[in-house]
Amino acid sequence: MAKKVAVIGAGVSGLSSIKCCVDEDLEPTCFERSDDIGGLWKFTESSKDGMTRVYKSLVTNVCKEMSCYSDFPFHEDYPNFMNHEKFWDYLQEFAEHFDLLKYIQFKTTVCSITKRPDFSETGQWDVVTETEGKQNRAVFDAVMVCTGHFLNPHLPLEAFPGIHKFKGQILHSQEYKIPEGFQGKRVLVIGLGNTGGDIAVELSRTAAQVLLSTRTGTWVLGRSSDWGYPYNMMVTRRCCSFIAQVLPSRFLNWIQERKLNKRFNHEDYGLSITKGKKAKFIVNDELPNCILCGAITMKTSVIEFTETSAVFEDGTVEENIDVVIFTTGYTFSFPFFEEPLKSLCTKKIFLYKQVFPLNLERATLAIIGLIGLKGSILSGTELQARWVTRVFKGLCKIPPSQKLMMEATEKEQLIKRGVFKDTSKDKFDYIAYMDDIAACIGTKPSIPLLFLKDPRLAWEVFFGPCTPYQYRLMGPGKWDGARNAILTQWDRTLKPLKTRIVPDSSKPASMSHYLKAWGAPVLLASLLLICKSSLFLKLVRDKLQDRMSPYLVSLWRG
């Protein structure tokens, strides 16, 4: 008899979790509190239902080839970066293609998820749900929580003295949908993440003035990179990841800063990272131009509000502010769990590989999508779901929970004492995390093996963008179309741009032509290092750290 799995949420991660359950012959039942799929990608005119939704002008930050499900590429005519409507259409196509809708119970709220009395033997859960005022109870063999981390708006009013005296409008970005209603107003946006940048840029076209306040600053990335190719596809490559492991981090950071400042000087634009703060990045194509045109004014952090003004850290005062928009993120919670599980699941240090809670005797509960990645969250959550369903089925194993819990508790104590830094909120390197989870499943691509069997494919896998299809080339869940998807990914990237063909126009050399000149030596070196132990790689990197940085910097400067 197939194991019954409860999937909480029918957003991006919920849909992939349903499909992965079906792929492993499990029996999923998905509970979705709204009336449709897509989660935050389903646009609504308001957020009165308490659910976080996208604002109307939102455009994806990760290109289509990097943010698709691994066995379901976007149509070639889809734009590389798309609005929320196009992306939701893709989710709908995915759900219909794999016949997932029949597993979803809409307008159903999960009230509680509790361990059954015999949990230590069975690993089963009691799940109580409510639909149209009627409660239902069911027993499940496993649970996948796919509610994401955009749940509760974080509105830190207590951190801003005088905010309660302010007579203007105060709102969180969750409430922002369209720029209408802000015409002629002076708007202060607090927080500079992707959302803060987007809202500030959009309001700069209608508001009288937009002030953008940031404590830390940020590096601003554009969606397009060299030769106009999508930025994600140019930097998220195994060859780049290999180089990053060998070359000194100081040198790599210097190169990155030099490249980003080449577009515009971040310090001159008031965007440079505050000294002592961690570097962070946002994707925004228009912010520099808006600052250059004076439509957006960069400000330091706010230290105090009055009835109509804001006082900033640098001593400046901005008068006659009409609206304050907090783009200060979200907090996540699991109200349907009991303590101590409820609190433990909010601490990422107590989640094995950011997925499995460590305090459970049986690995029958998984938190999907509670992770920050330097890349596509969609492909990351899909790979998590593939791993989790195989653990549920007994095909993959995880270490004993007692040992993991002990190690995590010790690490937490060391963090509190200042011995270790708390990195739980840091974003994970995309390729490293994906490879880690793929290795647990048995789907991590073997570069040496690919090079021996299929050199052309190996070349694309190592030097090309690390698209999700790479994790369908081998092992469980292998997809016969993965090879072709990888070899044609640039065709799908360029197809939506080919709307005006100029006869006999000169075509710039592609990146692959340049790679061929230096790729073979790097590939050979990487193959040798891959065959060696990671200890050897670490030794090489450590030796190079201090010795190479001054030389490389001086060489680069000429």
From Swiss-Prot:
Liver. NADP(+) binds at T60, N61, T195, G196, G197, D198. FAD binds at G9, A10, G11, V12, S13, E32, L40, W41. Its EC number is 1.14.13.8. The keyword Ribonucleoprotein does not apply. GO terms for molecular function: flavin adenine dinucleotide binding; N,N-dimethylaniline monooxygenase activity; NADP binding. It is a single-pass membrane protein. Signal peptide: none annotated. Keywords: Endoplasmic reticulum, FAD, Flavoprotein, Membrane, Microsome, Monooxygenase, NADP, Oxidoreductase, Transmembrane, Transmembrane helix. This protein is involved in the oxidative metabolism of a variety of xenobiotics such as drugs and pesticides. PANTHER family: DIMETHYLANILINE MONOOXYGENASE (PTHR23023). Belongs to the FMO family. This is Dimethylaniline monooxygenase [N-oxide-forming] 4. The lineage of its organism: Eukaryota, Metazoa, Chordata, Craniata, Vertebrata.
